Each structure stands twice: as structure tokens, then as C-alpha cells.
């Protein structure tokens, strides 16, 4: 502050003290900051001083309001005997803008005690101030006290109630209104959409169409489009689209984006693309929304193609675009494309470690590249909870439980608070490693140490851990003490453990619970049939398969795929359609001879008992993951690591066979089934035969 301004401030300070305005003293410092004394308002202090000397406090207050010095302005209001209406208007306006409820109440109280009779403008400003500050009780008191109300008064109250979700109060006032404009309707329709009542919003919008002189504006139809999208009602969406065209609002590109989103959410992807193509000035939000619609509809190729168009346009992808594309790569396990996106982000100057780390970690872990996932987290200055959690889960699924627990420890040391998903992954790591006592310790720490509540997922993980370890009595005790009803996932875990240990009685109990929850899920029937077969109970096994046939349940075929030179090759069990099928089967037969020489014994116990032993062995050759592994070996150079993905859990025979294949071919073979990654190398699997 220069010498001239300091002198002016000193003069003003002295004047205030003489006038016994000592409450100003604590606020004087604010007059000297850059908000008040700046090149455009360097004489502000002099103006306030001069006006106060002349007892023109109302005008001084106006100056302070102009400088947004609300507290000082309200303090000075006590010196003003009869400030003009404009002064009250200015004060209330600043209170509204800054959400200053306490100052607003002081201004309102001054109006009451000063004898000033407010007009409709000031009443409405008081209403709006209380509503914007979220004090609807005070707003309603003002509304009820008003001698007269205009349309604005009603609109402010209706909108205020709707904004905070008090829809019953809002609708009651709305229905009492003798006159409504587009603002009234929009406030009510918006309130219903925000409160997740899109059906009510659409009913009200339809009613609006039938009311004379109630023409919807661009905001009304935007909200109506969002409501149609929320209920996925394409008929209503198309009706609103027609209204937009008839009302001449179809030149607004924001509306086009809303329509595109509506068509996409209703599953009309081609219509959404037509709208997208009509948008002249496409922003990154439009691009990202359309790309996301393709991915959510499993139209992957078109989604990636549109992303390529975006990259070639003058518009630049943002963090949401990259996250969506990386998530698609994760879902499809297309690591090569994911790496390209990662590289592109870096080349164009985005910092992938700052905003897309969780998507990158998820992509790399789902593709089985756990080292790259670790590199992403290790490179983050401050990884977020999602990144930590994804990596912990990835380590668990990739057969690195010790690494999973190490990163959980690092998460805690970083000051990040774990959530219930984090503990699901931590418990999963213990499950995959058979760390029962450690898992129990983590389970009880959720409530005792971290002050979180146990969820159904936590109990499912604990039961899975106990089931895989054969601790069935302890498992029963946990289930009986659960505060919630056991889920289908929990009973499936019980059934899986019973399958491993041949616990038929408990398996039948779990199966009965699953039949109640999901009577058409083939996995339960197949698992029970296999349990009976393994125990030599062929009559029960036959009854189970007959039951499947009677109710029309069919086993989902196993399918496996591998990517060679950016082309995906999919194999289904016993499918002969692949052009290299004969070569693949012959190669597997040769491998089987070598495997037997090294001690391989085919696991034929689960194959139908009325088939000859030789045919049982032959049937095992045609399992989808064996076909995919053999093809990948034949299609790559010697020593190349290969990856295969499967939609179901690996069977015992395939798991054992691939261990032998990895040793014979000297290959690192990674297989991701429905539960985890299996990394086979030198005749061993990362799961330790515990899956």
C-alpha cells in the first residue's frame, strides 16, 4: 500500500473512532487489501469517508457493496436512519450472491425495525436470498408475511423447495399457482429429475404441453430429454424430440447433445450417431459421450474407430475420454491397444499418472501385466484410493498375494483410508494364498480398527477363504452369525469349496439355496453333477443332468481366446471351425504323449462315466483353453510368452496339463479364467494349485 492510501486509511480510521464505530476497527485491515485499494478503485476509502462525514450512510453502504465488503456494509447499516430501497436491494443482492445467511438476517431485521415498508422487489429479493442460502424455513416465513405476491414470488418458493428436494411442498405451491410461466414448469420438472423421479417429470412435461401459453423453453426440454433418458423410454424421447423441432429449438447444439445421450441410453445407438453427425461444433463432451455409448452397447470396433476420428480432429480428448477407452481395453483384455492409448496420452502432454492412473492400473491388471500396473502406481506422486485398490486386487488375481498385502500396507502409510472394496481385494489376496489366519485378522480389523461396517461382500470373501481351506464348521458358524441374508455369491463359494473337498452334504445344502435364488443358473447343476461324479454317485449325477434337461437349463460353453498380431482368435470346446483345427489337435496329441512320459495323468473322473477311458482322454483334448494355448504356441516364435483368456473357471485337467505344457515347451503361459490369473512356468503355476 502506498503512502497516499495509508494516509487516507488513517483519516478514515480516526473518523470511525470519533463516531464510536469501534466495531469497524477489526475490519479496517480489509480496506487496505487489493480488493479495495487497486488501480481502478484507489479512492474508495476517501469516498466512504466523505459520505460518512456527510451522514450519507446509504450511499457509503452502496460503495462497500460494490466492493463486496459485505460485513463492513452491514455494520455501517446500523448508522443509517432511513436508507433508500436501493441500499436494501444492494445489500440483499450481495448476501444472495455470497450465500451470507447471517448478514442477510441482519439486513432483514433492520428492515423490520427501521419502519421501512418494503415493496414487492425487496420482498422477492429476501425470498431469493433465503432460498439461495438454503434456509427454506425463513423463506417460507417471508412468503407467508408478504402482503402481496407476484409470479416471481411463487417461482422463487417453488424453485427453492425443488432445489433442496422438498418436492411435496414445491408441488403443493405449484398447484396453488393461478399463473405459471416456463420458469415455474422448469423448476418443478427439474426438481423431479434431480430427486430421481423422472416419470413424474415426464407427466408434468406432458401436462405443460396442454396448458395454453406455457411454451417450454430450452431448459425445460433439456430436462425432459434427461428424464426420458433416465427411464429409457424411447417413445417419450421421440415425442420430446418432435416438440423440439416444432418449437424451433433444434438449432441449439446443447440440446442435440442431450438428444444424443437420450437415444444412446435408450439403446438406439444408430439414432444417437445420426444426431452426433448433425452437430456442427462438436465438443469433447459430445465425442466422449458417443464413444462411451458404443462401448456400453458392446460395439467396440465402432467405439475405437470414433476415438481414432477424435484423435485426428482438432478437438482433444480429455481425461474422461481416455478413462472410457482404457476401460474398454480392460474389458476386452486388449493390452496392445491399451499401451498405444497410454503412449498417446504421454505424447500429447497429458500426465497419465495424475488423472487416469486408476484406469491404467485396471487395464494392465485385467490384461495380466501386473508389472506395468505396479509401475503406474509407483510413478504416481499420490495414488488415489481407486488406484491402490485396483493394484491390490490385480496382485491378488495374478498370484502375488504378498505383493497385494505390501501395497495395502503402503496405502495405509500414505494416509489413504481404505473402503469396503479395498478390503474385498485384501481378503481376496488372503483367499488366493490360503492365508486363513491373516484373512480373519483383516476381516475383524474392518470394524475394530478401521471403523467400517462389514458388507455382504466381506462375508462372502471370508466364507470363500474358509471353504477353500476346508474349514466347514467355522464356515457354518460365520454364516449363522451374519447380520444379513447370505447372497448367491456366498453360497456359490460354499459349493466351490465342497467341490474341492468332496463335502456332499454341505454341497447339497448350498445347491438348494442357489436353486431358490437362481433356478436357471447352469453352474449350480453342473457343479453338483461333477461332485456326484467325483464321488462315484452316478445315479445322482444322472438325475442332476436330467433335471437340467427338464427345466431347459443348458451349460454355458467354455470359450477361450488369445491375441496374435493384433488379431483375436476365439476357441470353443470341440469347435472344429478354426482353419488350423486339425494342426492344433495333432499338436496336442503329440504333447499328450510327452506329458505322459513326464507323469501326466488325465483327470477323467469328471467325464461322463458311460464313456470308454480312451474316449474320455480324447474328449479332454478339445477343451477350449488347450486349443487356444496350442494355437498360440504354434503361431509364435520359440520362447515367446503367451496369454490366453477364458470365460469359465479352468478345469482340473486343463490346469494340470498346462503345467506340463509350460515345462515341455519352455514357455511362460498366462491363463486368466473367471476367478484369477494362472501364470504357468517351468511346470509350476502361480496359484500353487489353489484356485
UniProtKB/Swiss-Prot annotation:
Domain of life: Eukaryota
Stretches forming PPR repeats: 84-118, 119-149, 150-184, 185-211, 217-251, 252-286, 287-317, 318-352, 353-383, 384-418, 419-449, 455-485
Gene that encodes the chain: PCMP-H5
Region (Type DYW motif): 597-691
Source species of the chain: Arabidopsis thaliana (Mouse-ear cress)
Region annotation (Type E motif) ranges: 490-565
GO MF, one example: RNA binding
GO process terms (BP): RNA modification
Region: Type E(+) motif, residue numbers: 566-596
Protein name: Pentatricopeptide repeat-containing protein At4g37170
UniProt entry keywords in alphabetical sequence: Repeat
Stretches of the chain forming a coiled coil according to its record: none
PANTHER family per UniProt: PENTATRICOPEPTIDE REPEAT-CONTAINING PROTEIN (PTHR47926), PENTATRICOPEPTIDE REPEAT-CONTAINING PROTEIN DOT4, CHLOROPLASTIC-LIKE (PTHR47926:SF414)
Family designation: Belongs to the PPR family. PCMP-H subfamily.
InterPro entries on file: DYW_dom, E_motif, Pentatricopeptide_rpt, PPR_At4g14850-like_plant, TPR-like_helical_dom_sf
